[in-house]
Amino acid sequence: MKIATLAVVSAFAATAIAGPIRPDGVGNDKFLIELGPGETQWVTKQQKHEMRAYINSIYKAGQGFVDITDEFGTDFTTAEVVPANYPKSALHAAVVNPMIAGLSKENLMRDLNTLVKFNNRYYESPTGVESATWVFNEVQKIIQASGVKGAKVEKFTNKFKQFNVIATIPGASKNTVIVGAHQDSINQKDPMKGRAPGADDNGSGTVVVLEAFRNVLKSKAIQAANATNTLEFHWYAGEEGGLLGSNNIFKKYKADGRKVKAMLNQDLTGFTKKGNPEQFGLITDNTNAELNEFCKTIVAKYAALKIVEAKCGYACSDHASAHRNGFPSSFIAETNFRNTNPYLHTADDVIANLDFNHMLEHAKVVVGFMGELAMTPNL
């Protein structure tokens, strides 16, 4: 995707300022974005939105950038990948199958109907904060109802208004397994005030992770504190602004020396194009090859759909934040990016376009991923 990122840079070269050197007069109105390893530009907020729109017009979905403004002047280097040992087969069906049995399409519908009622979930809008608050409160209710000892939820704040939500289920070890989804949405023409229901992008991933969390907490093994590894469920802020929330989290985890052994991203889980085979898209660029193989094992064991490998370009979603900070990550999307939802980032990204049966298959994969790795020793 090197050529693609260079094409984007060229398209904006007349107005954007080459990085990484801070140009004279640059203040809070300029942002440093990374379009690929070593490819940076200073842009205004308007240019950042225009660049995202330009990228979308060419690639439809995928190919993005990371806003690395806060890294300017630091010695950021891509960390060495945290080593992990993934099972070659699914070994904990007795734990996972009850989780799958509890998954509810009705819960997915109910939760998504709530999310799309916010005018938008843009990371700097009032309703973007309100939607994050709704997710936080919902997670809190789920934890309280479960009675699982040590389970907790916290707000991970950012310099912008919207916060990340992190739920933790402690295990016997500090080795951590994460599933995440961004909950913000954007109307590309009017980010702050425009209608952006974001049903697919990424209300669908948000509620899939929420429903998975609900059923992992119902597991007898989890309730008995038998998990070997710590589990985290993330709902990210500001993905549409350049992976802002997730990059903040994984930068801190890297600085803190956290042992994140696996991260699974759920972004776009509900759209299937008519006339095309229903399938998962397993993203192979900017992800971990060994973890991807484990994901194939999970899909084969617990889901009814098959996988097709695909690429989505640099920084296309939040798994890239984990990847650039040295943590193994995978991304399973609703399909390959050639057949993705044509309504993304518009007022027409609505529930009527989605398939809740497809979303349920994603939820099966998530609980399979989390359940299996929760119980894996020596990860």
UniProtKB/Swiss-Prot annotation:
It is found in: Secreted. Pfam families: Peptidase_M28. Glycans are attached at residues 202, 226. GO terms for molecular function: aminopeptidase activity; metal ion binding; metalloexopeptidase activity. Disulfide bonds join 312-316. Zn(2+) 2 binds at residues 201, 240, 345. Binds 2 Zn(2+) ions per subunit. GO terms for biological process: proteolysis. Probable extracellular aminopeptidase which contributes to pathogenicity. This is Probable leucine aminopeptidase TRV_05286. It comes from Trichophyton verrucosum (strain HKI 0517). The lineage of its organism: Eukaryota, Fungi, Dikarya, Ascomycota, Pezizomycotina.
